[in-house]
């Protein structure tokens, strides 16, 4: 699996911004079949940083209803990546 197939997108919320500033942790949506080692190698290769730890979790899709039609959002996987002290990823700076 290629690095750009593993890392889908960064997750940018108030909570993840606080984690980024205080704990040097970045949150990503990743491929569901990727493991921690794959995610670590992909982050290190794409962003040229060193990773200290990776936490992953499966997020269940919510059931949504629009009128009488009931559907479900897809399940996805989230990874919280802790960078080594002194390392940074600057893709949201200046926004």
Curated annotation (Swiss-Prot):
Any single biological process term in GO: translation
Q: Which GO terms describe its cellular component?
A: ribonucleoprotein complex; ribosome
**Keyword hit for RNA-binding:** yes
**Tell me, what does this protein do in biology?**
One of the early assembly proteins it binds 23S rRNA. One of the proteins that surrounds the polypeptide exit tunnel on the outside of the ribosome. Forms the main docking site for trigger factor binding to the ribosome.
Q: Which residues form a coiled coil?
A: none
Species, as recorded: Desulforapulum autotrophicum (strain ATCC 43914 / DSM 3382 / VKM B-1955 / HRM2)
This protein's name? Large ribosomal subunit protein uL23
Assembly and partners are described as:
Part of the 50S ribosomal subunit. Contacts protein L29, and trigger factor when it is bound to the ribosome.
**Pfam families from the UniProt entry:** Ribosomal_L23
List the gene name.
rplW
The record's family statement is: Belongs to the universal ribosomal protein uL23 family.
Q: Molecular function (GO) terms listed? A: rRNA binding; structural constituent of ribosome
Keyword Amino-acid biosynthesis assigned to the entry: answer is no
Which InterPro entries does the entry link to? Nucleotide-bd_a/b_plait_sf, Ribosomal_uL23-like, Ribosomal_uL23/eL15/eS24_sf
Q: Which UniProt keywords apply?
A: Ribonucleoprotein, Ribosomal protein, RNA-binding, rRNA-binding
């Amino acid at each position: 699996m290629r690095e750009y197939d593993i890392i889908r997108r960064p997750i940018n919320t108030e909570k993840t911004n606080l984690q980024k500033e205080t704990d040097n942790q970045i949150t990503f949506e990743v491929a569901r079949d990727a493991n921690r080692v794959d995610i670590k190698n992909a982050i290190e290769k794409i962003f040229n940083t060193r990773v200290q730890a990776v936490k992953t979790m499966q997020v269940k899709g919510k059931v949504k209803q629009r009128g009488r039609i009931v559907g479900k959002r897809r399940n996805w996987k989230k990874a919280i990546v802790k960078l080594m002290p002194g390392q940074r990823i600057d893709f949201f700076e200046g926004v």
